[in-house]
Swiss-Prot record:
Segments forming a coiled coil: none
CDD domains assigned to the protein according to its UniProt record, in alphabetical order: Ribosomal_L10 (cd05797)
Pfam families, alphabetized: Ribosomal_L10 (PF00466)
Gene source species: Paramagnetospirillum magneticum (strain ATCC 700264 / AMB-1) (Magnetospirillum magneticum)
Entry similarity comment: Belongs to the universal ribosomal protein uL10 family.
SUPFAM superfamilies: Ribosomal protein L10-like (SSF160369)
Gene Ontology BP annotations: translation
GO CC terms: large ribosomal subunit
UniProt entry keywords in alphabetical sequence: Ribonucleoprotein, Ribosomal protein, RNA-binding, rRNA-binding
Entry keyword annotation includes rRNA-binding: yes
An example Gene Ontology molecular-function term: large ribosomal subunit rRNA binding
Classification via HAMAP family: Ribosomal_uL10
Protein name: Large ribosomal subunit protein uL10
Physiological role: Forms part of the ribosomal stalk, playing a central role in the interaction of the ribosome with GTP-bound translation factors.
Top-level taxonomy: Bacteria, Pseudomonadati, Pseudomonadota, Alphaproteobacteria, Rhodospirillales
Length: 171
């Protein structure tokens, strides 16, 4: 990589870091190409991305961002998982690390909050933003459904009483 390519790469990574809410730092030593491809596919499906990084250039890109506190994690063969959803990248990385011990989670950052390995794993157990929205929508619609049921009940009872009276008179 020549100097201009490095400058472009740092600028590109800074742009990416400006758009995301979560960065997870991992060691990927020993992963095969097929395993890396599989992990990247799972990341894309979750709305996240996984990128192998050059440590020195990544430290330059982190300078001046809210993720600056994790710069010391970039030692050895590192890769980053990033996502806008604060849970997506953590969930995929934690699940993949459970299944494949070659992927090691070093830590991460949720905005300006630095996370250790346990923090990333704890974040992975939380429901995603879409799941939370679904639960909230369900909670909001439940009272309306119950009110509609209560309002319909007296009319149904009245109809059954009238039908019983009509059946009795007919007999």
């Amino acid at each position: 990589m020549d100097r201009t390519q490095k400058t472009e790469w740092v600028g590109s990574l800074q742009g990416t870091l400006g758009d995301v809410g979560l960065v997870v730092v991992t060691h990927y030593s020993g992963l095969t190409v097929a395993e890396m491809t599989d992990l990247r596919g799972k990341m894309r499906a979750a709305g996240a991305s996984f990128k192998v990084t050059k440590n020195r250039l990544t430290k330059l890109a982190l300078a001046g961002t809210e993720f600056e506190s994790i710069a010391d994690l970039f030692v050895g063969p590192t890769a980053i998982a990033v996502s806008r959803d604060p849970v997506a990248a953590a969930k995929v990385v934690a699940d993949y690390a459970k299944a494949n011990d070659k992927l090691k989670i070093l830590g991460g950052s949720l905005g300006s909050l630095r996370l250790d390995v346990n923090g990333v794993k704890a974040l992975a157990t939380l429901p995603s933003l879409d799941e939370l929205r679904g639960k909230l929508l369900g909670m909001l619609s439940t009272p309306a459904t119950r009110i509609a049921g209560v309002l319909q009940a007296p009319a149904g009872q009245l109809a059954r009483v009238l039908k019983a009276k009509a059946d009795k008179d007919a007999a």
